[in-house]
Amino acid sequence: MAASSDSVTRKARRPWIAAFLSILATGLGHVYVGRPRRGLLGLLALWLAGALWVVLSMHVHSPGFRVTSFFVLIGVWCAVVADAVRLARRDSPDFVLRPYNRGWVYAALFLLAAFVLQPLYTRVMTTAVGRAVLFPGDMMRPTIVAGDYLLVSPHPRTSPMRGELVVWRDSEGTDFIQRVAAVAGDTAEMRSKVLYVDGLPVEEPYVAHIDSAGDPADPRMAWQEEHLVRSVADYRPSRDNWGPIVIPRDGFLVLGDNRDNSFDGRYRGLVRSGSLVGRPVWIYFSRHPGSGEIRWDRIGRSVR
């Protein structure tokens, strides 16, 4: 380190440090090279690009577009990092240290970004734009399988329709993805695995039936008795035969697509509209939970 005649301190900027700081927190590398405003613009550009990507991916139902635009987003981030590296190379070795070119300032800015700014951005994104969810089970097979990572949009204020996929949250804070089978005012029942709504059979091409075993009565379905269309002296509902029940106001009946192996509304009871937290849109990543193999054919696929 050397002092010039005008008492300014000069110190070379190292490109690898600029890159490292930029990877730690977008824009931090620019602070290191004396361009904090440029770093802030880079951070805002990346946040805006991320939000735009999420919004577009939910409205453009093309796997190719979703994957390609994601790599464009990665390119934006790489461009911000590369810009900090370029500035470090250009200004070295005659860089004049600023008052903020100190280790504790970098540490403070990193903590601010990691524990304040990024969580705030994530909260805004999950509330207004969308969030990522890992689906761990097979209740929705074949539509959604274990190991699928989904992008979920906040649920619209309008009530969900029959056949729509929804994310709902139970009293313990656990999220589930299931399909709306009946809405308020509907009369729903099941006869020999076939769902009927208002007396008419429902076309369900997404449903899988894989179990041909017996169909014993299930005591977990006793909640249905208070919603029966008419009183039944010895009501013995089972997985494949139950109802008819009337869906009350502000209630929804949700079922899993893996109909023979799904712990859904038949057993849990009805879901209230206040429990709906989102709508799954598409699979952004998929990995087999056992082998760890990436399922490339599922990435970018819409779920309906």
Task: Give a label for each model feature.
Residues 2-18, 41-128:
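Transmembrane helix recognition focused on a "late"/terminal membrane span
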Residues 2-11, 16, 21, 36, ...:
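Soluble "head" domains of membrane/secretory-pathway proteins
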Residues 19-31:
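N-terminal signal-anchor/start-transfer transmembrane helix
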Residues 26, 75, 248-249:
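Alpha-helical hydrophobic/aromatic positions enriched in membrane-embedded helices and signal peptides
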Residues 32-41:
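Membrane-interface helix starts
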